[in-house]
């Protein structure tokens, strides 16, 4: 029994401290963490912080947000399924790991705050403005060599011209490097000859073969600790090297060339930086390196350079982005396995601003198969609807959307509802006059669900002509529906025997319809 003012005050303070110590974000039930088939530890499996979720296009609608905030027990997004790609801290090693998380809360506390932060983060990504890398490269790559300067390089050019093979690469590199040093030794102190201009000139004019380009890359590496003492100089040289790589060879590149170039990049990092040099590279050089690493199949470096470009507010060329997506598909063999989809999300997480504001048809086609929940699909479709090329994008992707809708569940009524949602979302783009080719695809999809009411409604509303061939397609779809959804929803309005009989008699006139009679 609490009898004194001091005791009352003590218990009140304890209660206050306890309330203050509660985690703002709700915690899920404790679940075992398993790795390599062994239980490591039981830990509190939290709903990830919004900053930890790397999904580049999922945005909960107002209805989803309201439902989550109005549900007392276990409110969730994406039906609480384990499909939200996240980068979280491992509870034991504290290393960052990639997982599929469940956006499922214990109760309603803190859900509104979590949603506000998540939506704010998506809004921030939406507001990022990207501009293409400047096509005017004169500002950093112009060679400051006069005709008099070039005349001083004659002996060096002769050395390069006399090299017929690079079998003894080291001795050839030393010969060129020694002659380069002689030029500086002979030259007066008043000269404006710079090592970067000489090397860029040689690369531009004598780097037309893979062998000589490798030789000049090695000479460049040797000069890193003598005359190439600024990152600005390396921008000039890297630009010309990468131009030659692009012009000289088609992938796959020579392994020796790849090794030489990547050794040079590593040497640049060691010379100027303790880590990586992207911050000091010109955006065009970063874009060149991105293109190079995509072509060599180095996805990790490609992701690094792509993310760095976007963080700097640079929009990569559409062709480069498309090649990057193709490289991801090649690496994962267009897999739809859960683990591979999660890994794919890690490689495209940086693309959020591009998806939101600069999405292309190829990018949207890449993203549709990655959706594992209908709400993800709706988020993507909403982005397409708001894009500058909405109609053209929907024309190209709608058949893929329709097909994808039917993969989330086997329940014909849910599928029918989802098909109706997609149809209603795209109708305004066409001024309610959806092209008949798309309406016909919707009708066949409703037939696969055995939904006679929606089929009849769309045929009448859009005055679809039922050719003999199209009737046969409908019949095949209805037969598949009967096999796949046997005895399910047979009494529901729109699905029952009466509606089936009515539909067959009114809309089908080919002899094959007898096979469908109830």
Swiss-Prot record:
UniProt superkingdom: Eukaryota
Per its record, what are the GO molecular function terms? Answer: translation regulator activity
- The principal localisation class reads mitochondrion
Q: Which UniProt keywords apply?
A: Mitochondrion, Transit peptide, Translation regulation
What does UniProt give as GO cellular component?
A: mitochondrion
InterPro entries this protein is in? Aep1 (IPR031467)
Signal peptide positions (record): none
Q: Name one Pfam family in it.
A: AEP1
Subcellular location(s): the record lists:
Mitochondrion
Question: What residues does the transit peptide encompass?
Answer: 1-19
What is the purpose of this protein? Required for translation of the mitochondrial OLI1 transcript encoding subunit 9 of mitochondrial ATP synthase.
Task: State the similarity comment.
Answer: Belongs to the AEP1 family.
Q: What is this protein called?
A: ATPase expression protein 1, mitochondrial
